[in-house]
Regions:
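N-proximal low-complexity "stem/linker" segments adjacent to membrane-targeting elements
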Residues: 1-17
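Short, acidic, metal-binding catalytic loop of nucleotide-sugar glycosyltransferases
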Residues: 22-30
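Glycosyltransferase specificity loop/lid
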Residues: 33-51
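Active-site-proximal specificity loops/subdomain of glycosyltransferases
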Residues: 51-99
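GT-A fold catalytic core of metal-dependent nucleotide-sugar glycosyltransferases
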Residues: 87-138, 154
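Conserved catalytic core of nucleotide-sugar-dependent glycosyltransferases
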Residues: 119, 123-178
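Catalytic core and acceptor-binding pocket of nucleotide-sugar-dependent glycosyltransferases
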Residues: 160-264, 268
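Long, low-complexity C-terminal extensions of enzymes
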Residues: 240-320
Length: 320
């Protein structure tokens, strides 16, 4: 049994349900997707849909609710914004699910990720390590966005995994944490992940050191697809090569991270990403094909499940 957690409000349900469908079509064994619902509409909709292996979780409860007076992830005024509260749920949500459901392990996955290969590939690569993280390849250290990405993170519910998890949670909820205002509070919960490897080196696996890499807008220009259908790639020496054990070999890219993807379903168009580091990736016809397919998949999901969203439109769609 694979345990997975994601989150969104109602407006992003089409992305979360696309993730769910991609997992259902690629997973070799049963999985449960725990869905942290950021508003009442998303919680009601998922309960009404009653989809197999998808468990809606109400975040308006003691262990997960937002404290409007709290500072999440940073002591700057921005720490009181809703998005910083959302950042806190990566760690708090995992901790809550471990406690409530006695899960042996879990993957936290952003809702705008889509799997093309079995998630079991990630579990096999991490082996016995208690925590597994993906490095950024587009920027060298130091960087304000952090050397690692929180789009996919794996935790075991054991002493080593919980030591890291509790540390991460404290970073994002405790304004007196010593790493606040020390250069690690610059990108929500993400920059703190750099500390995992430094403080808990024996517990951490870094993806990219073996067979798997992270597909994302900021990484695509460093990859060459050898087999697009199987998502087999090689990559050139990226700026963040020191974040991995750089080896000239073939890798599997089991998922794409469609971050900043904004569709306009009514006009059959979309903006692929708001990623500032690289807007050239859509020049690659294979990447553009993947984005076209993702748009159509999300549109089908939205129509099939009767979703409507005020945020599913963009002012200027770039691709049609």
């Amino acid at each position: 049994m694979k345990n997975i957690v994601t989150l969104s409000d109602y407006n992003y349900l089409y992305k979360g349900l696309a993730l769910y469908k991609s997992l259902a079509s690629t997973s070799s064994e049963k999985f449960n997707l725990y869905y942290l619902c950021l508003d009442k509409d998303s919680f009601k909709k998922l309960n009404d849909l009653n989809l197999p292996n998808l468990i809606p979780v109400n975040t308006d409860i003691k262990d997960l609710a937002r404290d409007p007076n709290a500072f999440y992830s940073t002591n700057d005024p921005g720490g009181q914004k809703f998005r910083h509260y959302c950042f806190s749920l990566s760690s708090r949500g995992v901790k809550y699910l471990f406690k409530k459901y006695k899960l042996k392990d879990i993957f936290y996955i952003d809702s705008d990720i889509f799997f093309y290969e079995d998630i079991d590939l990630l579990k096999k690569e991490s082996g016995d390590k208690a925590v597994a993280i993906f490095p950024h390849l587009h920027v060298p250290k130091p960087t304000h966005v952090g050397a690692y990405n929180v789009g996919v993170i794996y935790f075991k519910n054991n002493p080593e995994g919980n030591e890291v998890l509790n540390f991460w949670e404290d970073c994002v909820i405790n304004p007196k944490n010593k790493y606040r205002n020390s250069g690690y509070d610059t990108c929500g919960d993400q920059k703190y992940v750099e500390l995992f490897e430094d403080l808990f080196p024996k517990s951490i696996h870094i993806y990219g050191s073996k067979n798997i890499v992270h597909g994302a807008p900021y990484n695509y220009e460093y990859f060459v697809f050898l087999n697009f259908l199987k998502k087999v790639v090689k990559f050139t020496r990226p700026p963040g090569y020191q974040n991995i054990e750089y080896i000239d070999k073939e890798y599997i890219m089991p998922f794409f991270h469609f971050m900043g993807f904004f569709p306009d379903f009514e006009n059959n168009s979309y903006a692929p990403s708001n990623e500032p580091n690289n807007q050239r990736f859509m020049l690659d016809p294979l990447i553009r094909l993947a984005y076209n397919d993702y748009f159509l998949f999300c549109k089908n999901v939205s129509e099939r499940y009767g979703l409507s969203s005020n945020n599913s439109k963009i002012k200027e769609a770039k691709y049609a």
